[in-house]
Structure formats: C-alpha cells, structure tokens
C-alpha cells in the first residue's frame, strides 16, 4: 500500500516534467529552402566560413607548441612554415569508442594536449588541443567530445575540479540505470522524467526507439547543470555559441554508421555518417550528400520541404551523442543476447507508449532527410534515399572503431591525425590496431572512393612488435604512399595502455567512483605523454617532427637532425611478424556476457527487495556497487594528473598485460554480472512500477 502511494505521487510529479523540451517544434521554413547539397562540392559554405576564424587561432597555438618542441634544436623550418599561411600544418584528433572507458581514456589524452591542464605544458603535449581544427568521436569517444563542446568547451581539468558534487559533469558513481542508489523515489522520478521527455517527441508524431531513452538517460551525466539535463539543447545550437562562432575550439564531429533498410548486418560497406554543427551526411558514394542538421525532422523530397512548415529541435545534442553509441541492434543478431533485447524492448515499451517496435533497436531519423536525393553514385543502391526513414547505429559497428573517415577527406586538408585507440582486442582488453587496419582496408572497397589511409600492420604483427605499449607513427614517408589515391595525413597512434591504473575495464561497466575516474584519466595522460616525458625526454620534439613532416616533404625543406632519430623510434618501418600469439584472442565482452548478467537479476538492490522481484542467484551482500573490472593499488582520490613520482608508476604495457591478464579475465565475469544484476533489478522495478500505474 505504501509503495503504491509512493509510485502514484512520483508519477504525478513526473507528469509535470516539460516534455516539450525534447520535442521537435514547428517553425517557418527559410525562403527557397533546399537543405541537401552534393558532397562532391566539397566543404559546406558554413564550414569554410568557420575555418576563416579557426585557422588563425590554430596557427598561433601550433606555432607556440612547435617553439617549445624545438626549443633546444637549431632549425629554421618553423619560420619557413609560418611565413606563409598556406604552409602551416593542420591537425585533427580522433577518439575511439568503448563506452565510459573510451570517454575517460580520451579525457586523459585531451588533458595531456590541453594547455589549460596543470602540468600539460611542462610534462605533456599542452597546446595541441588548441591547435586542432577538428575533434571527431564515435560512441564513448563522442561522449567526450560532445560533453566538452556543449559545456562551453570546458576542460577536463575543470571537470575534475568539481570532484564528486551531485551536479558534477561525469559524476557516475551510480550508473544511469540506478542514479540514486537506494533512493527509490528519486530513481523512479528520473526515469519517469525521461519517459515523459521521449513521450513528448512521440506524441508530436515522431518515431522514437530505445536510442531516445538511452540518449536522455546518459545526458544526466553529460549536462547535469542544465534543465532536464539539456533536453532541447541542439547539436546545431553550437553555431550560436560565441566560443565556437569565434573559432576558439575545434569543430566536433560525431560519427555513426548507416543501416540499409531491411537489413541487420553492419560491415565495412556501411555508409559512414558524420554530424557537425552544420550538417549531417556522408562522403561515401552510397549517399554522397549532406543536409542542414538544424532542420532534421522536416518532411522533404530531394532536400525541398513538402510544406511551408519546417522542424527545429530534432537534432537534440544527447540524441546525436546517443546515436553514435546505439549498439542495441547487435543484441538482435545472436540467440545469446535475446534475453537482453527482450528486456530492453519491454522496458522501452513500458516507459513510452507508441514506441517503434519494428525498428526499436536503432536510432531512427524520420522523416528521412535524404529522401529522394539524386546524389547517390550510379554504381550503388538507392535504398537509403528511397526509404521514408534513415536508420543509424553505433559508429564502430563496421569495426572502424576510430573515427578516421571524416578527417581523411582531402577537402579538410589535414597533415596529421592524433588517434586515441581504446578498443579491447587482446585477451586482456587492450588495443591491437584493428580499427586502423579496417580503415586501411576500406580505402580499397567501393565505399573507399576518394579516400586514402597509410599502410599499417596486421593485428598479429601489431602485438608481436609491442606497438600497443607506446605511441607510434604511421605514414611517416610520403614517398612510400604514392600508390594511394592521394597522400593521407600522418597518423600518431596513441593506444590505451597501462601505466598507473588498469584501464582495461569492460565496456559494460556503467559506474565509476571519483578515484576510478581520476585513475583512468591520469593513466591516459601518462600513456599520451610517455609517462609525463620520463620515458623519453625528446617525445615532444618527436611529436613536433611528426606534425611538420608532410609540409616538410612537400616543400622540400630540411628537417632537424633529431627527427631522424624520432622517426626511427616511433615510425612503423613495414616490419611484419605473423608469429601466432596467445595474447591476440577474443575477449569476454560479448553479448552472451550481457545476457547471462541480466538473466542473473537478484533482489539484492533495495528496489528489487521492495517489489519482491528477486530471481536468479543472490549476489554477495558485501559486494560494493562501485566495483571495477580490475582494481589498482595506485588509484588515487585526488584530481591531480601529474604523479608526484613518475618513475614509481612507470610500467611497460607488455609487462602489465602479462601480470594483469589473468586477473582481468578472472574478475570480468563476476564484476559484469554484479553490475548488471543490480542495474537490472532497478530497471525491472521501474518497469513494474510503470505497468502498475497503468492498471
């Protein structure tokens, strides 16, 4: 009886939530509106105008960085480059996917490149973020870039300084599934609010799916200080943000994969979509078009509105960020994950009336902004532009786990890409270069038209040569790349690796306490900087050599002598080693692990106990909610990213793997099971409560 009263009161309060905040709105169409353009025309006029403001700022920031990099080197090359604006190198940053692991590892790399971070200029690569023109992210990497961009380009340093405040960005001590731990009424109120927000969009006539709920739930960790966690904050609104308008931050690019109508499989032939504050679309021949992202949701034919009324607000920032990490379709492709999908489908249908059931596993963009487009390459099917809806999924489902594609376009004229890889390809959940290999392969496919990527090793060679233990460079000599469609950017590859904190955590870990967040970020700072430059005092200089390499070769300038040493130490020289290795074996993070975890729902959580939803095996009551895949004795509760004694935390990634691999595998199953058992109890309780309210 008491529980029924509590549920009724919370649901009544939830009804007052401003559902309109997430609901797209009708507006008047611009005069002579045509929202689609041919990708063959190059960059959009809006992006070109923005570059006029961004380029002078990146030029100054890069010059400052290179002066520091070559402070002890006698060279005139920087003067030669900066005397002509056309000769100034341009750089981009790409952050891989991998859930919260990717977000925090990417955050550590960004902190190392940000001159606002304490110690980044003295012990890291401070200033590179300020010198970057673009920052691309997919899935968890996009959670990072989106969080920073849409919080007024805040810094990782500033986020950490907020500590564990209730409204601190990235405070996920409790997972988004059970945000208030033992406070049932607040958790129920949160999910009621989310359901109300998504219901408003559905009631306005727009299709909604699991991705809408996913996006809104995650947003409370990205935009905690905004009303309703930023519901109504649009991706295109960055155009009107003074920091972005004035070119004072890199342009964020969100990456997602397109799914062909009537199919379920995503592979290298998938259409890669990019979303900037100006446009959504793809350079791939299967679409070859872009549309104004501000007017998503408008009924169009070949870009022209069918009525005088257009739509604004469909491009909710959280929805764009959630789209890039929408991987629920993978649950439908395996019998092992049927339990997980059934559970999620039931939950979403409970929270939102009229949710799309046929395509509930993807992000649905309907009406299709590219309906009737005439720009598809003649050698490709027109199924994407024939469909009434556009279907998008996690940007890493085609196995291109690093969002290289938008940064490789010749039109963007980049000389170098800093790639942060957070994949889990080895037996101990560390990267093995797979995303680079897939992007390399893609350039030779039909979808690779107009694309080039430098030669990279296979994954076995990558592991055998120890390339996962430190940063490495690819495409160092343009003279060896002349067989490609054009000379691609040089790649500085920065893999997630162990230094002071075991960062090989499961993608399905949904909560991190403050010390874990700091540990992940600090470890990535060290991985990005060769352990605060203690492993190689010349590393900043070597990064400088990599940055100027493309322009140096094209202009036939003389490199500083030290660059030869740098390229010997960091450039992959083409060596292949296919000796079989046990380290390169599948990890345990497959759909079956999710299903077994969800199937093991217990009544250990307070909400589960209240509703008597216990089932499966009871988890140990002494277990802590803030568990982690592998624990670190060196974890710290302070937000300082520079260790007091760097030498004490210097451990090679290879050595760390051999010592932690067995621990990781031993703990993976039990911890994943614990996390999902608690979360599933909460969500079953919420679903049950919502159902009860409708009876």
UniProtKB/Swiss-Prot annotation:
Q: CDD domains from the entry? A: cPLA2_Fungal_PLB
Recorded E.C. number(s)? 3.1.1.5
Keywords, alphabetical:
Cell wall, Glycoprotein, Hydrolase, Lipid degradation, Lipid metabolism, Secreted, Signal
Gene Ontology terms for molecular function: lysophospholipase activity; phospholipase A2 activity
| Pfam families named in the record | PLA2_B (PF01735)
Q: Can the keyword Hydrolase be found in this entry's annotation?
A: yes
Where are the residues of the annotated region Disordered? 612-662
What residues does the PLA2c domain cover? 28-577
PANTHER family cross-referenced by the UniProt entry: CYTOSOLIC PHOSPHOLIPASE A2, LYSOPHOSPHOLIPASE 1-RELATED
Which family is it part of?
Belongs to the lysophospholipase family.
Q: What is this protein called?
A: Lysophospholipase 2
């Amino acid at each position: 009886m008491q529980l029924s009263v509590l549920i009724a009161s919370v649901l009544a309060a939830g009804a007052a939530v401003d559902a309109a905040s997430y609901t797209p709105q009708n507006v008047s169409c611009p005069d002579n509106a045509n929202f689609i353009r041919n990708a063959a025309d190059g960059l959009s006029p809006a992006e070109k105008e923005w570059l006029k403001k961004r380029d002078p700022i990146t030029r100054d920031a890069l010059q400052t960085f290179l002066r520091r990099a070559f402070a002890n080197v006698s060279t005139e090359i920087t003067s030669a480059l900066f005397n002509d604006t056309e000769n100034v190198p341009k750089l981009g940053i790409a952050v891989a996917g991998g859930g919260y692991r990717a977000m925090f590892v990417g955050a550590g790399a960004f902190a190392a490149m940000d001159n606002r971070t304490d110690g980044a200029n003295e012990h890291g690569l401070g200033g590179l973020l300020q010198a970057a023109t673009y920052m691309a992210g997919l899935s968890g990497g996009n959670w990072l870039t989106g969080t920073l961009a849409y919080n007024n380009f805040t810094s990782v340093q500033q986020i950490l300084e907020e500590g564990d405040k209730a409204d601190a960005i990235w405070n996920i001590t409790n997972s988004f599934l059970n945000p208030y731990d033992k406070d049932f009424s607040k958790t129920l109120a949160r999910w009621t609010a989310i359901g109300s927000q998504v219901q408003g969009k559905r009631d306005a006539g727009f299709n909604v799916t699991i991705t809408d709920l996913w996006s809104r739930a995650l947003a409370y960790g990205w935009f905690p200080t905004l009303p309703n966690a930023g519901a109504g904050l649009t991706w295109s609104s960055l155009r009107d943000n003074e920091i972005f308008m004035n070119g004072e931050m890199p342009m964020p690019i969100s990456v997602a994969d397109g799914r062909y109508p009537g199919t379920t499989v995503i592979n290298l032939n998938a259409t890669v979509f990019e979303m900037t504050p100006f446009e959504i679309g793809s350079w791939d021949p299967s679409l070859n078009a872009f549309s104004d992202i501000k007017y998503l949701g408008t009924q169009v034919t070949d870009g022209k509105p069918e009525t005088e009324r257009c739509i604004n607000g469909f491009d909710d920032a959280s929805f764009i960020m959630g789209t890039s990490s929408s991987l629920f379709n993978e649950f439908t492709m395996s019998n092992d994950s049927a339990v997980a999908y059934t559970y999620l489908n039931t939950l979403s249908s409970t929270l939102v009336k009229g949710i799309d059931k046929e395509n509930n596993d993807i992000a649905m963009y309907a009406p299709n902004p590219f309906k009737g487009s005439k720009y598809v390459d003649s050698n490709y099917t027109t199924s994407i532009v024939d469909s009434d809806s556009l279907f998008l999924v996690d940007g890493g489902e085609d196995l291109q786990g690093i969002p290289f594609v938008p940064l490789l376009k010749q039109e963007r004229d980049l000389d170098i890409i800093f790639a942060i890889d957070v994949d889990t390809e080895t037996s101990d959940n560390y990267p093995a270069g797979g995303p680079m290999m897939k992007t390399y392969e893609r350039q030779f496919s039909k979808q690779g038209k107009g694309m080039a990527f430098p030669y990279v090793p296979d994954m076995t060679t990558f592991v055998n040569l120890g390339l996962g233990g430190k940063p490495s460079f690819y495409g160092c000599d343009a003279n060896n790349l002349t067989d490609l469609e054009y000379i691609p950017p040089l790649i500085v590859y920065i893999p997630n690796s162990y230094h002071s904190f075991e960062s090989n955590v499961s993608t399905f870990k949904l909560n991190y306490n403050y010390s874990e967040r700091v540990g992940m970020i600090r470890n990535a700072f060290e991985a990005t900087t060769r352990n605060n430059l203690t492993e190689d005092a010349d590393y900043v200089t070597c990064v400088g050599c990599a940055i100027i390499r493309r322009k140096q070769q094209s202009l036939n300038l003389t490199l500083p002598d030290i660059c030869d040493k740098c390229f010997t130490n960091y450039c992959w020289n083409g060596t292949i080693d296919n000796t079989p290795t046990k380290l390169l074996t599948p990890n345990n993070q497959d759909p079956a692990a999710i299903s077994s975890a969800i199937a093991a729902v217990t009544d250990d959580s307070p909400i589960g106990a209240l509703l008597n939803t216990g089932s499966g095996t009871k988890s140990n009551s002494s277990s802590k909610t803030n568990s982690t895949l592998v624990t670190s004795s060196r974890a710290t509760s302070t937000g300082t990213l520079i260790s007091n004694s760097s030498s004490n935390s210097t451990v090679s990634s290879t050595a760390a793997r051999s010592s932690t691999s067995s621990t990781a595998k031993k703990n993976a199953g039990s911890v994943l099971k614990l996390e999902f058992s608690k979360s599933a109890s909460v969500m079953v309780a919420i679903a049950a409560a919502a159902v009860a309210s409708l009876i």
